[in-house]
């Protein structure tokens, strides 16, 4: 879904929450919603608007926990540099989160990766080779 407003309106049963009530809950940060879904949709929309194709990675291995991981987006670098042109991107909507899948992915595919990113609602930083970007900087990737 490329329209975040349309996504929000479809996420709620019209009989459950009326327009004014939805607006008030949204403005007062009291909306009970899977914010991860919403933020991932916003990031996907920003990637598409910036000309990126949307790719993701998912492995639900039942036999090997080390292979079990999911990466929200895989972004290609415009130029191939020593086969390191894939940037894994994880989107985090909360303040407290883990990077288990991203760490596993980086370890498994380190020869093909350029820079791993985490898009989150906090300030920019670089920690252990991972670039943490605020959501509004997504379009700069």
Task: For the regions a language model picked out, list residue spans one by one.
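A cross-kingdom feature that marks ATP-driven nucleic-acid transaction machinery
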Residues: 1-141
């Amino acid at each position: 879904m490329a329209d975040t407003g349309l996504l929000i309106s479809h996420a709620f049963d019209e009989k459950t929450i009326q327009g004014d009530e939805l607006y008030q809950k949204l403005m007062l940060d009291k909306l009970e919603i899977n914010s991860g879904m919403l933020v991932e949709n916003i990031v996907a929309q920003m990637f598409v608007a910036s000309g990126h194709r949307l790719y993701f990675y998912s492995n639900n291995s039942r036999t090997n926990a080390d292979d079990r991981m999911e990466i929200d987006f895989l972004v290609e670098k415009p130029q191939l540099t020593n086969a390191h042109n894939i940037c894994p991107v994880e989107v985090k909507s909360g303040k407290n989160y883990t990077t288990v899948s991203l760490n596993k992915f980086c370890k498994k595919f380190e020869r093909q990766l350029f820079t791993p990113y985490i898009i989150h609602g906090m300030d920019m930083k670089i920690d252990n080779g991972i670039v943490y970007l605020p959501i509004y900087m997504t379009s700069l990737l």
